[in-house]
């Protein structure tokens, strides 16, 4: 690993890890549970990098030794063959460890561990776009279930012919944002709609937004900026729904954002849910402003989450899904059933590769971007 800045960073991580280990061994830390948890969590986040770095150093020493054996083998063909094979294997192992270390050293997205609000809006295509939005709700629900995440529909605007004009899913689980952030953008479908009598293929779209959940400390909202009205709501609650106004219509005046919540059983719960969605939307806007500010520094982008970015086309006639960022095709049937892990992992890998290239080209620029 010739890059001196990477070695310096690894040495710094190793030193920090050792200091945290000593800190955890101090009996005094047990008297402060919050500090104990913070230090333990930080140490755990560095552990894989440190262990990989240790393995890299050991492999490097073994490679030096194997090269010396090969050099000293002289005219012994059997010894030379064995030593040459070991040199080759160790060199390959060292290269793989270097790749892993570079990825581990990439700055982590601070939102990666967060739960999300996933918003799907019908785009161009009329009734067919709403039906398509409903198909995407099902696809993401299936994927979330396969990941052992929990999914809840927290806001919806139903369309007359089926599907949704707009739907918001709350998805909770392990590192939800780290995977689904690559799904933000425009999803285009090409198929013959059920409402089409002539059998012609139509093109419709739906827009997906991925919003990390935030609390009221991260996003503060002035009470005078919101206007809340209530209405009677259908759904859970039995006869109560006909007597009590449980639905909440929240309007955020500065940006004209309207949120309608009916899914909870009480007005208070729907009000809290509407505020939760509003905070996520405002935080998402702030994130996108930050991304726009640095996007000119990036030579290329994968899954930046731009609302206008057409990321994928679902072609029913050819039973094919094309991800335009990857330039790859996938099975339509499997994708619609929520089998999108391969697509997501490919996006993660490509994003890591681009960031590594930026890091190699200019460590200072890469640091600024992240």
UniProtKB/Swiss-Prot annotation:
InterPro entries, sorted? PCRF, Pep_chain_release_fac_I, Pep_chain_release_fac_I_sf, Prokaryotic/Mito_RF, RF-1
Give UniProt keywords alphabetically. Answer: Cytoplasm, Methylation, Protein biosynthesis
Q: How is it modified after translation?
A: Methylated by PrmC. Methylation increases the termination efficiency of RF1.
Q: Where are the membrane-spanning stretches?
A: none
Sites where N5-methylglutamine occurs are at 239
Q: Where does the source fall among the domains of life?
A: Bacteria
Main localization (coarse): cytoplasm
Kindly list the GO CC terms recorded for this protein: cytoplasm
Name the Pfam families on file: PCRF, RF-1
Record's SMART domains?
PCRF
Q: What are the subcellular locations of this protein?
A: Cytoplasm
Record GO terms (molecular function): translation release factor activity, codon specific
Question: Record's family?
Answer: Belongs to the prokaryotic/mitochondrial release factor family.
NCBIfam families, alphabetized: prfA, PRK00591.1
Function as written in the Swiss-Prot or TrEMBL entry = Peptide chain release factor 1 directs the termination of translation in response to the peptide chain termination codons UAG and UAA.
In Swiss-Prot or TrEMBL terms, this protein is called Peptide chain release factor 1
Q: Which organism is it from?
A: Rippkaea orientalis (strain PCC 8801 / RF-1) (Cyanothece sp. (strain PCC 8801))
Q: Which gene encodes it?
A: prfA
